[in-house]
Regions:
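Charged, gly/pro-rich active-site loop segments
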Residues: 2-3, 78-142
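Short connector loops at helix/strand junctions that flank enzyme active sites
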Residues: 13-15, 29-31, 39-41, 57-60, ...
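Short, basic/aromatic recognition patches
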Residues: 1-21
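Amphipathic alpha-helical interface surfaces
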Residues: 8, 57-64, 103-107
Length: 142
């Protein structure tokens, strides 16, 4: 059953990781797992951290967003034993490449408060994306 937008947004805010999809100019959709945080103004912060090794200082998702600012964040809940608990939420996003430093700093603080690994804010950057639309579905009543 389709989730009300408020319920879909609440699940997005409460969830702690998802799949960020950006658009590669040649390959099409690039999907990567990410940690994220959502602020009360409807912005999503996705860290580019120094915790995990990276192949490059500039990630492909960043290059993709420079070419095409559209992105999608997909979160879901899967219960193999009880399919009545299945749900997913999709947030359509727009990159805010030139976002105000204060917004990026606030999202960085939110990430630090949410994830122990980010307590010391080991970020190279925080990608700032504005929520354009949120939709969702759940097997059971919302």
């Amino acid at each position: 059953m389709r989730l009300a937008e408020s319920e879909a947004r609440a699940r997005l805010v409460a969830h702690d990781h998802g799949i960020l999809c950006t658009v590669h100019v040649e390959r099409g959709v690039d999907a990567v797992p990410v940690a994220y945080v959502v602020d009360e103004d409807g912005y999503v912060g996705v860290p580019v951290d120094r915790v995990k090794p990276k192949a490059s200082s500039r990630l492909q998702r960043e290059r993709n967003l420079e070419e095409d600012p559209r992105a999608t964040l997909l979160v879901e809940h899967w219960d193999r034993g009880d399919w009545s608990q299945l749900w997913w939420v999709r947030a359509e996003l727009r990159s805010q490449g030139g976002a105000a430093p204060a917004r990026a700093a606030a999202l960085a603080a939110g990430l630090a408060g949410r994830y122990a690994q980010y307590r010391d804010q080991p970020f190279a950057r925080v990608l700032v994306l504005r929520i354009v639309r949120v939709t969702g579905w759940a097997a059971g009543a919302s």
